[in-house]
């Protein structure tokens, strides 16, 4: 038997120390990585529950193991809440990640060698949308579309031309670094014109979509995938949604289990259910609205200070800043901001002359700072501090001064209030 007094600090002091240090970092640094967020104490409590002990291969009421009556309740709640939240006819809450959700769709609807059409990683797509290092680029004939050079927005004419030329079996819409509204219906029309499936990866904007702050693709696409963290603010995991089609639903279920996964993570599925419930609250709607406002304020500040924001602004939670004109690298800017306790990620930008481990830009996102409580004034100040650092990159006096401001602002807005 286990003794509850044997806490982590007693059992593994090294891991405990690392966790405490990370907790301190999260409280004292400003997090601007667009794919990150802080999840709620209720979600974290659920992830640490005894549900982690239960194996439950299969689906609710169709398990291969006994003793699943209570985890069936949990998974069915997660399914029902996901369908309600996003207006979907079908939901699979078992994917361990967004990439596995995408892999399951590929396995369900395609065979190796089929042609796919997805957004180029260099222009804001995701690895699983056909990038060469990914399974999606290795196992399938991947054709890539990109951005219009003048507008910095998706080149729908190029998508249509490529679709007609290569006749893909599936077109993938969605992104990991794109700041504008996507015309899901335009993608649907292009897919229909060549008889292709349309898959949408809405991982980055799922929270905005859940509250109507960004257009929903769920009723338009054949299949929609997402992560459950990022803007959605739940546990790390994946989700597959679809409109009613029994054939596709059966294929999707089989692709997850037994296709690419075995037992589902019931403690994570329960945490997903909790986060879906949280996402139905009025407070959450207010939060998502502020996420957009904060991103727009920050992007506009960079523009006013003379920096190139790709596409000229943002309609969601993120934006890209290109430093090609300044001759700066994304890596150098990332490092300098990090020294001031401002965390971003270097990111490739259109026509980037630098390799992926260097880049010429950064990606900035506001989900985390908005969770802390930052408002427009805070975000305007923050963007100005970032511009000050970029204007005099490497000036340690500037970095030190701004680091002090960052620590003070973080103290004003703690992530987790003490009891």
From Swiss-Prot:
Site (described: Plays an important role in substrate specificity): 229
- State where it is primarily located: cytoplasm
Q: What is the designated name of this protein?
A: Serine hydroxymethyltransferase
User: Which GO biological process categories is it annotated with?
Assistant: glycine biosynthetic process from serine; tetrahydrofolate interconversion
Name the catalysed reactions: (6R)-5,10-methylene-5,6,7,8-tetrahydrofolate + glycine + H2O = (6S)-5,6,7,8-tetrahydrofolate + L-serine
Q: Does the keyword Amino-acid biosynthesis apply?
A: yes
Name the Pfam families on file.
Answer: SHMT
UniProt EC number: 2.1.2.1
Q: Name one GO molecular function term.
A: glycine hydroxymethyltransferase activity
Q: Which NCBIfam families match?
A: PRK00011.1
What family, per the record?
Answer: Belongs to the SHMT family.
Which cofactor does the UniProt annotation name?
Answer: pyridoxal 5'-phosphate
List the keywords (alphabetical): Amino-acid biosynthesis, Cytoplasm, One-carbon metabolism, Pyridoxal phosphate, Transferase
- Which cellular component terms (GO) are annotated to the entry? cytosol
Task: Name the pathway.
Answer: One-carbon metabolism; tetrahydrofolate interconversion; Amino-acid biosynthesis; glycine biosynthesis; glycine from L-serine: step 1/1
Compartments where found: Cytoplasm
Where does this protein hold (6S)-5,6,7,8-tetrahydrofolate?
121, 125-127
Query: Which segments does the entry list as coiled coil?
Result: none
> What does this chain do?
Catalyzes the reversible interconversion of serine and glycine with tetrahydrofolate (THF) serving as the one-carbon carrier. This reaction serves as the major source of one-carbon groups required for the biosynthesis of purines, thymidylate, methionine, and other important biomolecules. Also exhibits THF-independent aldolase activity toward beta-hydroxyamino acids, producing glycine and aldehydes, via a retro-aldol mechanism.
Q: Name the domain of life this protein comes from.
A: Bacteria
Q: Does the keyword Protein biosynthesis apply?
A: no
Q: Which residues carry this modification: N6-(pyridoxal phosphate)lysine?
A: 230
- Could you describe the subunit structure of this protein? Homodimer.
């Amino acid at each position: 038997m286990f003794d509850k007094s044997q806490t982590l600090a007693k059992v593994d002091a090294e891991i405990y120390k690392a966790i405490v240090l990370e907790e301190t970092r999260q409280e004292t640094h400003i997090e601007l990585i667009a794919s990150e967020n802080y999840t709620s104490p209720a979600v974290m409590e659920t992830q640490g529950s005894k549900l982690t002990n239960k194996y439950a291969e299969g689906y609710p009421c169709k398990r291969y193991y006994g003793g699943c009556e209570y985890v069936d309740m949990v998974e069915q709640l997660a399914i029902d809440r996901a369908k309600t939240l996003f207006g979907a006819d079908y939901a699979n809450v078992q994917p361990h990640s967004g990439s596995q959700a995408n892999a399951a769709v590929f396995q369900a609807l395609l065979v190796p060698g089929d042609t796919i059409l997805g957004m180029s990683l260099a222009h804001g797509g995701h690895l699983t949308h056909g990038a060469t290092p990914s399974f999606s680029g290795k196992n399938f004939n991947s054709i890539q579309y990109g951005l219009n050079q003048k507008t910095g927005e998706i080149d729908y004419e190029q998508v249509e031309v490529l679709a007609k030329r290569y006749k893909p079996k599936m077109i993938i819409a969605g992104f990991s670094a794109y700041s504008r509204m996507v015309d899901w219906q335009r993608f649907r029309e292009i897919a229909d014109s060549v008889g292709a499936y349309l898959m949408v990866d809405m991982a980055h904007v799922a929270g905005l979509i859940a509250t109507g702050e960004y257009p929903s693709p769920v009723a338009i696409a054949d299949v929609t995938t997402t992560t459950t963290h990022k803007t959605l603010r739940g546990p790390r995991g994946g989700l597959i949604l679809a409109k009613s089609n029994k054939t596709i639903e059966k294929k999707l279920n089989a692709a997850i289990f037994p296709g690419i996964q075995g037992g589902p993570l019931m403690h994570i599925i329960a945490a997903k259910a909790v986060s879906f419930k949280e996402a139905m609250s009025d407070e959450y709607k207010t939060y998502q609205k502020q996420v957009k406002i904060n991103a727009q304020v920050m992007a506009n500040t960079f523009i006013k200070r003379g920096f190139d924001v790709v596409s000229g602004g943002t309609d969601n939670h993120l934006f890209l800043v290109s430093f090609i004109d300044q001759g700066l690298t994304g890596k150098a800017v990332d490092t300098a901001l990090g020294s001031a306790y401002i965390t971003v990620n270097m990111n490739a930008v259109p026509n980037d002359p630098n390799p992926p481990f260097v880049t010429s830009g950064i990606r900035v996102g506001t989900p985390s700072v908005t969770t802390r409580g930052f408002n427009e004034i805070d975000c305007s100040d923050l963007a100005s501090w970032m511009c000050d650092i970029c204007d005099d990159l490497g000036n340690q006096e500037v970095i030190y001064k701004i680091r002090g401001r960052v620590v003070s602002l973080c103290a004003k807005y703690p992530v987790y209030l003490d009891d």
